[in-house]
Amino acid sequence: MATQQNKNRVYILLQYVLAALVLIAAVEYFKYKTRISYEWFHCTVQSEELFDHPEGSPLKLWAIGGPSCDKRGELKTIMKRITMDFDPNVEPVKFCIVEDTKVKSIHYPIEDGNKGDPGYISFVGYERDSDVVEQACASYAATVFNL
């Protein structure tokens, strides 16, 4: 009887392992299939150099994406990009974030080619570019933050 019970436990264990593997495979398959449409599911940061400076030039950042890229998603994506790309241990970082109040909190893309206006834009640069960042932020009357 003990061997029959052990066989049942092994069989149940194999079922759980197989179910876990199927779930992992389903998640990986979903990630593979949506890789092509990544920006539809996530916010993607777009950037533009403010001026032609050498290394570490100040940037204008904004985020675009699909239905999940509302103003909250845009703000999170921009802040993540600032903290990943600019290291305050190397040199102090200055940035500001400007909200476009004409854009609704939840705004969906108009069509594939046109994602609409961004809800937030940001100007960011290192301390050596502080004049450029402060000038860009002042044109929107935005507060400059320091990291």
Swiss-Prot record:
Signal peptide bounds: none
Biological processes per GO annotation: lipid metabolic process
Oligomer status and interactors: Component of the ceramide synthase complex.
Key words, A-Z: Endoplasmic reticulum, Lipid biosynthesis, Lipid metabolism, Membrane, Signal-anchor, Transmembrane, Transmembrane helix
One cellular-component annotation, GO: endoplasmic reticulum membrane
The species this protein was found in: Kluyveromyces lactis (strain ATCC 8585 / CBS 2359 / DSM 70799 / NBRC 1267 / NRRL Y-1140 / WM37) (Yeast)
Name this polypeptide is given: Ceramide synthase subunit LIP1
Role noted for this protein: Component of the ceramide synthase complex required for synthesis of ceramides.
Ranges of the Cytoplasmic topological domain: 1-9
TM region positions: 10-30
